[in-house]
Curated annotation (Swiss-Prot):
PROSITE patterns on file: RIBOSOMAL_L20
Protein name listed in UniProt: Large ribosomal subunit protein bL20
CDD domains hit by this protein: Ribosomal_L20
Keywords, in A-Z order: Ribonucleoprotein, Ribosomal protein, RNA-binding, rRNA-binding
A GO-annotated cellular component: ribonucleoprotein complex
UniProt-listed InterPro entries: Ribosomal_bL20, RIBOSOMAL_L20_CS, Ribosomal_protein_bL20_C
Organism: Chromobacterium violaceum (strain ATCC 12472 / DSM 30191 / JCM 1249 / CCUG 213 / NBRC 12614 / NCIMB 9131 / NCTC 9757 / MK)
NCBIfam families: rplT_bact
Length: 119
């Protein structure tokens, strides 16, 4: 068997990791062993945070809807119950957007929710 020299593949592997670590501070950007650990940790954070992002945005939307619904005299839970009874299927993202940027439209939706709760 011929002798396999691995200089080319090792260099390519090192370059790939160091390219991923570009922009890091200190030795994390130019020492392969430390850069490899930093890139691995960054990947773990990215994986975790892609899932947390969904939760955090939902929390934000609910907080905004709750604040706007309370301004119109209805707490969040009763508002959402009223929407369900009125068969209004608008998701939280759109409701939060209306609550922030189109208050009159949101107020109309709250009135419909109130009417369906009273009926």
């Amino acid at each position: 068997m011929p002798r396999v020299k691995r200089g080319v593949t090792a260099r390519a592997r090192h370059k790939k990791i160091l390219a991923l670590a570009k922009g890091y501070r200190g030795r994390r950007k130019n020492v392969y062993r430390i850069a490899k650990q930093a890139v691995m940790k960054a990947g773990q954070y990215a994986y975790r945070d892609r899932r947390q992002k969904k939760r955090q945005f939902r929390q934000l939307w609910i907080a905004r809807i709750n604040a706007a619904a309370r301004e119109n005299g209805l707490p969040y839970s009763k508002f959402m119950n009223g929407l369900k009874k009125a068969a209004i299927e608008i998701d939280r993202k759109v409701l939060a957007d209306l609550a922030v940027f189109d208050k009159p439209a949101f107020a109309q939706i709250v009135e419909k929710a109130k009417a369906s709760l009273a009926a």
